[in-house]
């Protein structure tokens, strides 16, 4: 089973349009299930996009996907660019992350047992290679590097960006803690970032939501093509590090 975390536009390519609510011990998650293609679409911000990044119930979302039998997750994340050569309209495939969040529930192991999950390769290496091959096949421009996750919902200041650009390549608000929670449940996770704007201080203008939404709309068909190719890839048995992530991570 494949999980897609993204927006309502992706529902167009699924065979199934009935929204379902999945109850978990961490809360509820809203999904659309395409049983024919074994795909689950999860709306990160809610069906009406009314949940801000810092209020998303990340644990309920990831746990719901696990409960439904999802093994591989493709997450769609909108980001701002920290580098001039990573232009709005390009894609970005993270290979690492740095996070500056403050209030998020970020682990499934607050009690019961102590788990130190390895984050040497936080994004599934197998899925990253597959995603890059799909982007290459479609001749879609993309970059690779470090995703910086901030708390939101505000945009970052110029001084913050001046620091972040020394450490990372793009900045966003939704990529963490999804990536860690997925690894804790031994699921494969990869992120397809769509670059919507230059970050504050990189851009010569003030940042607006209209600018972001306009670029998302402009990239929508490309995003849908990548998602469709990912769904139809024809995955075999998992041979990556993700499936055994807890093997050497649990104390006691």
Swiss-Prot record:
For this UniProt record, give its keywords in alphabetical order, as a comma-separated list: Glycosyltransferase, Purine salvage, Transferase
What residues correspond to the site Important for substrate specificity? 156, 209
Where on this chain does phosphate bind?
Answer: 8, 44-45, 174
Indicate which residues the UniProt annotation says bind substrate: 173, 197-199
Cite a single GO BP annotation: purine ribonucleoside salvage
Against Gene3D superfamilies, the record matches this protein to: Nucleoside phosphorylase domain (3.40.50.1580)
Per the record, the domain of life is: Archaea
Q: Which GO terms describe its molecular function?
A: S-methyl-5-thioadenosine phosphorylase activity
- Keyword Glycosyltransferase in record: yes
Task: Cite the source lineage.
Answer: Archaea, Methanobacteriati, Methanobacteriota, Methanomada group, Methanococci
| Substrates-to-products reaction catalysed | S-methyl-5'-thioinosine + phosphate = 5-(methylsulfanyl)-alpha-D-ribose 1-phosphate + hypoxanthine
Record-stated family: Belongs to the PNP/MTAP phosphorylase family. MTAP subfamily.
Pfam hit, one:
PNP_UDP_1
What does the entry list under GO cellular component? cytosol
Q: What organism is the protein native to?
A: Methanocaldococcus jannaschii (strain ATCC 43067 / DSM 2661 / JAL-1 / JCM 10045 / NBRC 100440) (Methanococcus jannaschii)
Q: What is this protein called?
A: Probable S-methyl-5'-thioinosine phosphorylase
Q: What else is known?
A: Although this enzyme belongs to the family of MTA phosphorylases based on sequence homology, it has been shown that conserved amino acid substitutions in the substrate binding pocket convert the substrate specificity of this enzyme from 6-aminopurines to 6-oxopurines.
Any idea what job this protein has?
Catalyzes the reversible phosphorylation of S-methyl-5'-thioinosine (MTI) to hypoxanthine and 5-methylthioribose-1-phosphate. Involved in the breakdown of S-methyl-5'-thioadenosine (MTA), a major by-product of polyamine biosynthesis. Catabolism of (MTA) occurs via deamination to MTI and phosphorolysis to hypoxanthine.
Its EC top class is: transferase
Q: What is its EC number?
A: 2.4.2.44
């Amino acid at each position: 089973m494949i999980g897609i975390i993204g927006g309502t536009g992706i529902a167009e390519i699924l065979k199934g349009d009935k929204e379902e609510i999945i109850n978990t011990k961490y809360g509820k998650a809203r999904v659309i299930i395409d049983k024919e293609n074994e795909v689950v679409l999860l709306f990160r911000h809610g069906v009406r996009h009314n949940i801000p990044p810092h209020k998303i119930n990340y644990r309920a979302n990831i746990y719901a996907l696990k409960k439904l039998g999802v093994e591989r997750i493709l997450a769609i994340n909108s980001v701002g660019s920290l580098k001039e050569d990573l232009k709005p309209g390009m894609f970005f495939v993270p290979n690492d992350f740095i996070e500056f969040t403050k209030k998020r529930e970020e682990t499934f192991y607050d009690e019961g047992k102590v788990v130190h999950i390895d984050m040497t390769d936080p994004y599934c290496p197998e899925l990253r290679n597959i995603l890059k091959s799909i982007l290459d096949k479609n001749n879609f421009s993309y970059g690779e590097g470090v995703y910086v996750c901030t708390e939101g919902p505000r945009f970052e200041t110029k001084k913050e960006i001046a620091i972040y650009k020394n450490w990372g390549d793009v900045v966003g608000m939704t990529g963490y803690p999804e990536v860690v929670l997925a690894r804790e449940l031994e699921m494969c996770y990869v992120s397809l970032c769509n670059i919507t704007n230059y970050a504050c201080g990189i851009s010569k203008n003030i940042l607006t939501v209209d600018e972001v939404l306009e670029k998302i709309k402009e990239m929508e068909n490309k995003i849908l093509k990548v998602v469709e190719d990912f769904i139809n890839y024809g995955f075999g048995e998992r041979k990556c590090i993700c499936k055994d992530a807890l093997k050497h991570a649990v104390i006691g």
